[in-house]
From Swiss-Prot:
UniProt subunit comment: Part of the 50S ribosomal subunit.
Family stated for the protein in its record: Belongs to the universal ribosomal protein uL13 family.
UniProt-listed CDD domains: Ribosomal_L13
A single GO cellular-component term on record: cytosolic large ribosomal subunit
InterPro entries: Ribosomal_uL13, Ribosomal_uL13_bac-type, Ribosomal_uL13_sf
Gene giving rise to this polypeptide: rplM
SUPFAM superfamilies on file: Ribosomal protein L13
Protein name: Large ribosomal subunit protein uL13
Domain of life: Bacteria
Function: This protein is one of the early assembly proteins of the 50S ribosomal subunit, although it is not seen to bind rRNA by itself. It is important during the early stages of 50S assembly.
Organism: Pelodictyon phaeoclathratiforme (strain DSM 5477 / BU-1)
Amino acid sequence: MSKTLSFKTYSAKPAEVDRKWYVVDAEGQVLGRMASEIAKVLRGKHKPQFTPHIDTGDFIVVTNAEKVALTGKKEEQKSYFSHSQYPGGVKIDHVKDLLKKRPERIIENAVWGMLPHNNLGRQLFRKLKVYAGSEHPHASQAPVEMKVN
């Protein structure tokens, strides 16, 4: 006799989640398209046991952040705005300057904008590791290369 069909909704438990490590080479990749794929894997939406309120995602290591591609005139025109809530506390970072000083920050900002802005989102964001060059210290985790279209 076969098993009976069950119509119960599956909810993943944190202890049951199997986490993998992936490495993404950002060289020549379009920033937004790459960031959306990374956010999907960090969130765990690529897994059949995805549960919205549980961290079911995997770890992502991004290398060559300094060689990420920006379409259009974004390299000259795009900027990130922040304010310290004090008078005169406006801080504007231009992408052109960030590519020279902190290229990791560009990918981090793009991915953070695609994650939920709550406690779960901060937990997911901690699983993203971004490096400007091609070297990373996570070889012992044996990350699998992930292709991004």
